[in-house]
């Protein structure tokens, strides 16, 4: 419930731009969110393993 209320609070918009922060669009996690994908590292990895992110592949060297 706390996560849902925080997401709803964020959608209303902050009084100042500095107060805005990124959240994962898939799970709502506030930490470690990649701006380019709007996903947290956990969801990004999961979708990459499933092959649902075009052009992303596992690094090998």
Curated annotation (Swiss-Prot):
A single MF term (Gene Ontology):
zinc ion binding
Q: Where is the signal peptide?
A: none
Per UniProt, the cofactor note for this protein states: Binds 1 zinc ion per subunit.
Keyword terms of this UniProt record: Metal-binding, Ribonucleoprotein, Ribosomal protein, RNA-binding, rRNA-binding, Zinc
| Cofactor(s) the record lists | Zn(2+)
* Residues at which Zn(2+) binds: 24, 27, 40, 43
- Which Pfam family would be a valid example here? Ribosomal_S14
Query: Can you cite a GO biological process for this protein?
Result: translation
* Taxonomy, superkingdom: Bacteria
Q: Quote the cellular component terms of the Gene Ontology held in the record.
A: small ribosomal subunit
Q: Which InterPro entries match?
A: Ribosomal_uS14 (IPR001209), Ribosomal_uS14_bact (IPR023053), Ribosomal_uS14_CS (IPR018271), Ribosomal_uS14_sf (IPR043140)
Q: Which PANTHER family match?
A: 30S RIBOSOMAL PROTEIN S14, SMALL RIBOSOMAL SUBUNIT PROTEIN US14B
Subunit text:
Part of the 30S ribosomal subunit. Contacts proteins S3 and S10.
| HAMAP family, sorted | Ribosomal_uS14_2_B
What is the similarity comment for this entry?
Answer: Belongs to the universal ribosomal protein uS14 family. Zinc-binding uS14 subfamily.
Q: What does this protein do?
A: Binds 16S rRNA, required for the assembly of 30S particles and may also be responsible for determining the conformation of the 16S rRNA at the A site.
Q: What is this protein called?
A: Small ribosomal subunit protein uS14B
């Amino acid at each position: 419930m706390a996560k849902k209320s925080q997401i709803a609070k964020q959608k209303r918009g902050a009084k100042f731009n500095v107060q805005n922060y990124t959240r994962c669009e898939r799970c709502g996690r506030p930490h470690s969110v990649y701006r380019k994908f709007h996903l947290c590292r956990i969801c990004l990895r999961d979708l990459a393993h499933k092959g649902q992110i075009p052009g992303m592949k596992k690094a090998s060297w």
